Amino acid sequence: MCIRDSIDLYHQFDLLEYPVEILPDRALVKRQMSRWPTGLDPEVIAIRERNKERIISCLIKKIERRHSPSSRFQFAEGISYEEKEARVREWWNTARFHLSMAIKSPTELNFFLGYSLSDETMSLLARAKKKGMPFFVTPYYLSLLNIEHEGYDDATVRSYIMYSNELVDTYGSIKAWEKEDMVVADEPNAAGWLLPEGHNIHRRYPEVAILIPDSMGRACGGLCASCQRMYDFQSERLNFDFEALKPKESWDRKLRRLMRYFEEDAQLRDILITGGDALMSQNATLRKILEAVYKMAVRKRKANESRSEGEKYAELQRVRLGSRLLAYLPLRVTDELVGILREFKEKASAIGVSQFYIQTHFQSPLEVTPEARHAIEAILAAGWTITNQLVYTVSASRRGHTAKLRQTLNALGVVCYYTFSVKGFRENYAVYTPNSRSLQEAREEKIFGQVPEEKQAELYDMIRNQRPLGKCLVRFLKENGLLFAGTDRNVLNLPAIGKSMTFHTIGLTSEGKRILKFDHDGSRRHSPIIDQMGEVYIVENKSVAAYLRQLKEIGEDVNEYRTIWNYCEGETEPRFSIYEYPAYPFKATDRMTNLEL
């Protein structure tokens, strides 16, 4: 065992002899939160305006070099530079322009970043390109980075688009972390669910299934370096070839068949439309998908009329759209899109669907820009709830960072859902944060957003019914002495079934990595196969000592993390009530269909 990584063992024996009392410090957490600016701060906006000016000049040169007659983004012959600049400023406000002008190579990335990338970074990115790794960054998202010597720390944003050595080394052999995502025709997946052929439906739980459409929804507004579906980009099932991803005539027939799966299943009452990214689908495509979901829900409800009490099937109660575009490209949220969402909610509410979620992914308060604020306000006004999922990368795990993100999102009316530990294998080593740090954050920082039990019903009603939600939430937090609403659960997606943070540390590897024995989350329903599985054993991707060295390298005072060694056991937090399903006005069957054990 490496001596410097075996220090965990020393700390465990030391704690047996000298236990440490952990006393969360509200004033300290507030100071730590104040370190992190948001994309709404005037100083940040000023830097980004300068970024935008630089990027616009790059875009003019890019358009001048393009000779694609099919592109709508071209300059008329003979116009002046000022006219070109005015045209690009106009185009800047449309999502399609940013997708069309996305940066797709290391050389172009360096050009748009003012040649600020190091030789080492360029060499790494060139190696990634040679291995066939896709690059896709929109001008909008690139404008969020800071290439100036002064100003805000953009590490959390930057690490989402810059690849690590480990990711590049392993690309081509990356495997799915979650075994349920490996689908073989005519065979049950790891959770025991029988699924339609293809890769359109993924399922872990009895009550919810994921739908991945054959559309531009198989693309994203950018490629996250820690993407949980990197293996799908590797196989090119997900990609950035928008023309090839446009729905074919056969998709309409396939969609009807996929809807039958939801309609004829006894337990499904929640559909999560994702990808890729659900909002990458064109408006006409998204409208068709939602209409198909609506008609399926109507038929399922109608079929229940002939079923007796105790035999009735689950009816659709929740519809979710998974999208990171609120952070990656909020300009996608147009009046037309908002109209589609509003129209669907009004129709679906009339047939018993009561929960409508945009499940988004802000990683940093720096991603919460004026454009993102406008998109959030528009979606909330359409009657949908916006929930956030965070991936707890190294840069996002710095003291106060996640707390500040919660506070920033709450002020706009976004409620937090999950804080996910980074999953995966060696490919995610660079961004991996040990689970002990996630527990530490929950116990020492998130605790100052813990909603009192007697106030949870009030918060539930507010999120469901009151607008403008952001102002209502800020008032609620102030009245109850909370820094933010800690409605998210810190969890790990297990490689077997479901999410959990219930574990014991049972050993260390020769490299000092903790070996954790996980149990499943007992607060929710699982596939019956769980009774055959028992505990799940996971070797963490990185030792705690290596993680602390990494924090020190990026400027953190590791003394602020000294209690991390205490966190060797975890327990999954209770789910906030807004994430529970409502009760049925009838007795549904307990029988499970599409299941083979």
Identify the residue ranges that each predicted region occupies.
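Flexible, acidic/Gly-rich N-terminal and inter-domain linker regions that tether
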Residues: 4-204
